[in-house]
Amino acid sequence: MNLPRFLLPVVALVAAASAHAEITWLTDLDQAKAVAAKEKKAILVDFTGSDWCGWCIRLKKEVFDQKEFSAATKDFVLVELDYPQKKKQSAEVKAKNKALSEKFGIEGFPTILLLDSNGVPFAQTGYEAGGPVKYLAHLADLSKANTAEGKAKFAQGKKDEGLVRGYGEELEKLITPLLEKKDLAAAETAIAKFIKDKAVTGAAKVTLSVNARVGSVQACKPGDHTAVLKVLDEIIADNPADLTGELKEFRAQVAAAQAADKDKK
């Protein structure tokens, strides 16, 4: 096909743009919400430390910068909120990003937060090895939680995290003197009383129990896998099955470590 000469530069520009198309990342969450509402998409927010966080840099290089990841834009409006150490940012951007990290309870980088078009979170993840195709499948699986029930469950999980953090600090102060004396029995009694008195239930109870009890065993009986397994079995037996899935996986890891130690002897 012969094209008029004045169209050739235009065609060349279009071809170049297609060949080197870049994925668009917004840097303003309010703008992203407006776009998401209009296009009926969810929002993916990357909380990153672009010039210092090793895992953030790997995630960008291995996943976000790969052409296959452009498929994510079919379902998500992409947002990057950066928390650099050397890169210059305006005071306004720093303040806005800080407020968002506090609002969503971001504690580490990279954190990938998935929101509905109104900005309500329903899932959270981070670095995952395997490249863009595997990561897209991971996002598709997480997107199943973009329901009223999923968002409520996510909100409860965040609430539990805050509860566990606060109670964990209190409990640590309470049992540290006992652990310094290697008095595991007294520490166990104090932990049980604390959880009962605070009326901690559900996933928060499981997490608090594991952190405090396993930590106590490790402090008093370092390297004793049998003692750790005993504690884990008690916690698993004392809580509903739907709350102990990850705990059972952890138990399997401890059992494997125990078996490996026996093989070395």
Predicted regions and their residues:
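Bacterial N-terminal signal peptides that target proteins for export
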Residues: M1-L8
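Bacterial N-terminal signal peptides
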Residues: L8-A16
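Bacterial Sec-dependent signal peptides at the C-terminal "C-region" and cleavage site
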Residues: A15-I23
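Non-globular targeting/processing and membrane-anchoring segments
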Residues: A21, L139-K265
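Thiol-based oxidoreductase modules, predominantly thioredoxin-like and allied folds used
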Residues: I23-T27, T48-G49, E62-A95, I106-F109
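Extracytoplasmic/secreted proteins, especially bacterial periplasmic and envelope-associated proteins
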Residues: T27, Q31, W55-R58, E68, ...
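Local sequence-structure signature of Cys/Sec-based thiol-disulfide redox active-site neighborhoods
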Residues: T27-F69
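Non-catalytic, surface beta->alpha helical segment in thiol-disulfide oxidoreductase systems
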Residues: E62-F64, A99-T147
